[in-house]
Amino acid sequence: MKDQIIYKRSIHQHLKTLLATVVLTGLALCSKAQLNPFQNMYFQNQYMYNPAMAGLDKVLNLNLNYRQQWSNFPGAPKTGSLTADFQPADKVGVGLNVTDDQSGLIRSTRVMATYAYHLPLSDQTEQLSFGVSLGVNDSRVNYDAINGDVTDQEIAKYNQLKAYADGDFGVAYTSDKLYIGGALPNLKAAFFKNSDSRFDADRLLFITSASYKISLEGTGQGFVLAPLAAFRVVKGYKDIVDAGANFTMNDYGLYLQGIYHSNESMGLGFGLDQTNYAFSFNYNLETGQIRNYTGGAFELGIKFKLFQKSYNKQ
């Protein structure tokens, strides 16, 4: 009887060690993935990170994005995003920004409502925009993903944490060629560091980016090249620099893009951009040591541009 008890304890200890190894490896993959956001936010949908870009155009923009680690590793991260924005009145933009992220056993949902004001400058194509988002952020353990004791007290304690209010602030300068923008996301984490005890790794604290559209005259095909540079401050991680370019073929409604991230990863993508809709596919590949453990991540995006005729009649 005593030998059976010792044997069971030994098995239990080995299982705990194995589980810890799996969790730590999963956290490494999830952490790395969270450092590489949706690639569409750099060119096609800046509202994803900057509330100042809500309602910039007189059309209802509806964007759906899905991102998943190209790996069969249990708990590999996957993220879904929905944004909707439009301009209900002159100089005013509103939007809705929803993100659902699953990393390992943790599932986080963020729902934000946005108000933006667009101030016209001397040139009709120039605007200075300000935006603020307010909403809720909720993180919880996904019981369906647990292969073990679901009655563990630590799991129960984590899920007892309530959803909390959060906010973002952004500013942007835009013209027909130049974009310069910056945002302070996750304001609660930035200004109330001790107000929440839940685990929050790799939270974005600040981001700024700039891009400039260069028309390639003489091609006769409406080719436009837009170089981009961005800078990100991430909690618990070294600052990240992003550099890339977007090449648009307007006459064909196609674009190609590539972005390098200083955290040893690169994103490549292409898309179809038509009058009423757009589609994109992006692939993020790791260039550092973690490339041996993951096949990178893929991202799918679809955009609908609604009620354009209604706006044009006004």
Regions found by a protein language model. Name each.
Residues 20-21, 31:
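Cleavable N-terminal signal peptides
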Residues 34-314:
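Subset of outer-membrane beta-barrel
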Residues 2-19:
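Bacterial N-terminal signal peptides that target proteins for export
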